[in-house]
Amino acid sequence: DMLVVSSPIQEALRRAGIESVCDQALALLVEPETIEEAYRMETVAGPQCMVTPVADFTPARLVAVGAEGKGEALAEAALAVMAEFKPQHTLVEIAPCGLPLDPDSKASLVENRDQYARAAQLFCDCTFDAFFLNGFTTADDLKCALMGLRKVTDAPIIASVDVQGDGGLASGRGTWREAVEVMAEYGAAVAGFSTLATPDQARGLADAARET
C-alpha cells in the first residue's frame, strides 16, 4: 500500500514569521503551539506519515541552530507536537550533520558516524515508527549516517538522497546507484530520492533502483 508523507511545514512557518532553522528550533521549544498550527493545516490533506518539524539532531546541527545541549528537549518536543494529531506513522527526520568528511580518513569517518549515533540515542526511549535520513548528497555521508544509526538502534530506516536527472547525486560526487548500494548494504528499509528531474527521468531513477 502507498503511504502519504506529510509535506515540510517550513512554508507555513515562514508565513508565521519563523524564517530560519534556528527560529524553528526555538519555536519548537518555547512556542510549540505555532508548530502545532502548521501541522494542523498539513493534516487536512490526511497524510498517514508525519515527519518531525526539525531534523537538526546531530551535535553539529544542534550547535548550528543554537540548541547545543538541548538535544533531548528538542527530540521530546518534536514527538510531542505530532502526538496530538495521532498520525498512523511517526518519522524522525535526521539531516546531514554538515561536518567535513574525508572518505579516506578513518578518524573523519568515525567522527561523522558518531554524529548520527548520538542523534539516534536521543530517541532510544521514545515511541516512533522509523528514522528518516533525508537531504543527503553523497554516498559517503549516507554511509556514515546508516552506520551511526545501526550502532545504537534497530529501528527501521528510510533513506533519501538528492539526485539529478542524469543519475548523479546533487553534490556532483557519486551516483544514485552507488547510494542505493549503500542503502542496501547498511540496512535501510526504504530507499528514496528527491529530484527536480522530469517525470520520465524520475521514472528512470526508480527503475535503476529496482535493478541495483
Where are these regions (language model features)?
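Domain-level signal for soluble alpha/beta catalytic cores
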Residues: D1-T212
